[in-house]
Amino acid sequence: MIRAATTEDLTELSRLYVAYRVFYGEGPEEQRAAAFILDRLRQSSGRYFLAWNGRDAIGFMHLMPSTNTLAMRPIWLLEDLYVDVSARGQGVATALLSHAEAFARSTGAERLTLATAHDNLAAQHIYKKLGYVREDHFLYFHRLLEP
């Protein structure tokens, strides 16, 4: 089952978020992570969704709204997607992505956009299998801003 996360899900969502951070080589920082998630849950712009197996949260995703100003339509950015190691290979990521697409469509979105690490071949395989295509039209740049 997949449903929108609420503040009541903070413990489970934080646990998965910490595991996600560790997967990408970041420190766990449990207290900071929980505060970060709680702040995001209280904001109304982004959406967290949890995948459940009974009472256990086994995956999460975080969607952020944006706009395609050329098409003058909303888009959603899949900022985070993580499935617990114990639940991988069971279709959880596919179910989360399907839910994300249905949610985005319900808002009139033009597209769902995501990014993944170059070496995350398992995720790339899933995305390609589900019809996601690599963006070659634009180059994306970023600049880190020091506090």
Model segments located where?
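Conserved GNAT acetyl-CoA-binding A-motif
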Residues: 97, 104-115
